[in-house]
Amino acid sequence: MNKKFAVLIALVAIAVTSAVAGMKNPVVGGQEMYPSKNIVENAVNSADHTTLVAAVKAAGLVDTLEGAGPFTVFAPTNEAFAKLPAGTVDSLLKPENKATLTKVLTYHVVSGRLSASDLKKQIKAGNGTAELTTVEGGKLWASLQDGNHIVLKDEKGGMALVTIPNVFQSNGVIHVIDSVVLPN
């Protein structure tokens, strides 16, 4: 009996080790994102989020986003920032526009850790739309496109598609988006 038990334990150990080895961290901007790191520690490694990281630094939000949270961050890519009118990003990064930049960035953050599954449940419970209150105090509305892809609508009517959901962090979750969302 002990021999069978030992073989069973060995097989379970092999199966668990194989399952863990097969799990991969999500890749964002060419780099693996680690759930043991916080939002800022992961974001600085993403080649697709250099503009966002520069903006977070300029707004003085690094300490906040390195904090305990949890936070849900809808993280626009460099391409998303490039869609803004010419000169907008450069203007926002100027010290005299720190308050406006902070307002825009905190509009991309919701308190709590909302996975894509959580958002989809809220969308279903809201008959197709979930209303999210941002850290900035404004509203975002989440809905589904093609039945599965989460789309955000901002207060100005702009839309952003979640392109990479569920990038879990030690202090929350990042959902990569393809457009910058803007508050009123």
Protein language model annotation of sequence segments:
Residues 1-7:
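Bacterial N-terminal signal peptides that target proteins for export
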Residues 20-184:
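Mature, structured domains of secreted/extracytosolic soluble proteins
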Residues 7-8, 83:
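Short amphipathic alpha-helical "recognition" segments used for binding
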Residues 2, 18-21:
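Cytosolic-facing loops and C-terminal tails of multi-pass membrane proteins
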